[in-house]
């Protein structure tokens, strides 16, 4: 039995600070061991949308505790982490820089690889986290100003069927993916 990788994921692309520990089962399917999310909705509510500087400041204040809680809740030890991944974009640059800087420093301190993750690709693949969904599949990705209709053909293989720059609300908050079975 080979050792399954343990990945620490960090997300700070907009107004949520999040950390998760993920591994895989014997079949190679992802297993989420912990997923800690701190929302900033209350911080930005009075402004009618996300204020990037306030969002970045909140990430800086919370990221240590969020990552520690993700590790604690996973039941695993920090020494068991095999790699650290952080969202690299698209997103608000001041927010992304918090997660990227923290993730790179954390990986460096552990002498582990660092993985920069495309925010939209993460959304495109997230339906596979909790299902036996097979490629190809159709995906409606609604994320701020990057809404797309995709044929997800495999890891790194996407065909854009349509796109829209329209926000879904005054705040570019991510909306979870909707999916339909593909007949292709």
Model-predicted regions and their roles:
Residues 86, 94, 114-119, 160:
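General beta-strand structural signal in soluble alpha/beta enzymes
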């Amino acid at each position: 039995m080979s050792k399954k990788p343990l990945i620490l994921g960090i997300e700070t692309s907009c107004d949520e600070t999040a950390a998760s520990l993920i591994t895989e089962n014997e079949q190679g399917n992802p297993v989420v061991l912990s997923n800690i999310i701190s929302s900033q909705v209350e911080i930005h509510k009075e402004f009618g949308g996300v204020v990037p500087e306030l969002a970045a400041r909140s990430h800086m204040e919370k990221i240590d505790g969020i990552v520690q809680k993700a590790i604690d809740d996973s039941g695993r030890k920090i020494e068991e982490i095999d790699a650290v991944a952080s969202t690299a974009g698209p997103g608000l640059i001041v927010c992304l820089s918090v997660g990227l800087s923290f993730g790179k420093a954390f990986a460096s301190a552990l002498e582990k690889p660092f993985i920069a993750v495309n925010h939209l690709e993460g959304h495109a693949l997230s339906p596979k986290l909790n299902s036996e969904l097979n490629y190809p599949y159709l995906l409606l990705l609604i994320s701020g100003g990057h809404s797309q209709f995709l044929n997800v053909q495999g890891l790194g293989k996407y065909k854009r069927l349509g796109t829209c720059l329209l926000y879904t609300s005054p705040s570019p908050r991510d909306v979870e993916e909707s999916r339909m079975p593909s007949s292709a």
